[in-house]
Amino acid sequence: MTIQTLFAASHHIYLGNALWYLICFAILLLLIKHFAWGPVSDMMEKRRQKVINDLDSAASDRKKAETLANEREAALKNSRQEATQILSDAKANAQKTGKEIVASANEDAAAIRKKANEEAAKAKSDALDSARDQVADISLAIAEKVIAKNLSAEDQKDLVDQFIKELDD
C-alpha cells in the first residue's frame, strides 16, 4: 500500500457512520437539554438575581451610609454650636459674677473705710474728752495744791484723802 492509497481511503466518508454520529449527537443534546440545561439555566438565573439583589443592597446601604453620615455631620455641627453657646454663656456669667464680686468688694471696702473713719473719729473724740478730763483733773490738782499751801496741815490731809478717794471711784 502506498501513501496515496492510504490517503485516498482516509478521505472517504462513510454515510452510515456519519448518520450514526449525527443521531448520537442529537440524543446527547436532548439529554443535556433535559437533564443539565434546566439546572444550569436555573443556577444562572439565581446567580443573576443574586447579583441584582447585591447591587440593590449595596446602593441601599450606600444611601443609608450617606444619610447616616449627613445626620452625624449635622449632630456634630449642632454639638459645636451648643458648645460655642455654652462657652459664650459661661464667659458672660463669669464676667457678670466678676463684676458683682468687684462691686461687692468695693461696697465692703467703703463700709470698712466708713466704719474705720467713724471709729477713728470716736477714738479721737474719746481721747480729746479724756485729755480734757485729765487736764481738768491736773488743773484742779494744781489749784488744790496752790490752795493747800494756804491750808493747814490737817485740811491738806483731808483734801488729799478726799482727792485719792475720788480717784478710786
UniProtKB/Swiss-Prot annotation:
The keyword Transport applies. It is a single-pass membrane protein. GO terms for cellular component: plasma membrane; proton-transporting ATP synthase complex. One of its GO terms (molecular function) is proton-transporting ATP synthase activity, rotational mechanism. Pfam families: ATP-synt_B (PF00430). CDD domains: ATP-synt_Fo_b. Keywords: ATP synthesis, Cell membrane, CF(0), Hydrogen ion transport, Ion transport, Membrane, Transmembrane, Transmembrane helix, Transport. The chain crosses the membrane at residues 12-32. It is found in: Cell membrane. InterPro entries: ATP_synth_b/b'su_bac/chlpt, ATP_synth_F0_bsu_bac, ATP_synthase_B_chain. F(1)F(0) ATP synthase produces ATP from ADP in the presence of a proton or sodium gradient. F-type ATPases consist of two structural domains, F(1) containing the extramembraneous catalytic core and F(0) containing the membrane proton channel, linked together by a central stalk and a peripheral stalk. During catalysis, ATP synthesis in the catalytic domain of F(1) is coupled via a rotary mechanism of the central stalk subunits to proton translocation. Belongs to the ATPase B chain family. F-type ATPases have 2 components, F(1) - the catalytic core - and F(0) - the membrane proton channel. F(1) has five subunits: alpha(3), beta(3), gamma(1), delta(1), epsilon(1). F(0) has three main subunits: a(1), b(2) and c(10-14). The alpha and beta chains form an alternating ring which encloses part of the gamma chain. F(1) is attached to F(0) by a central stalk formed by the gamma and epsilon chains, while a peripheral stalk is formed by the delta and b chains. This is ATP synthase subunit b. The lineage of its organism: Bacteria, Bacillati, Bacillota, Bacilli, Lactobacillales.
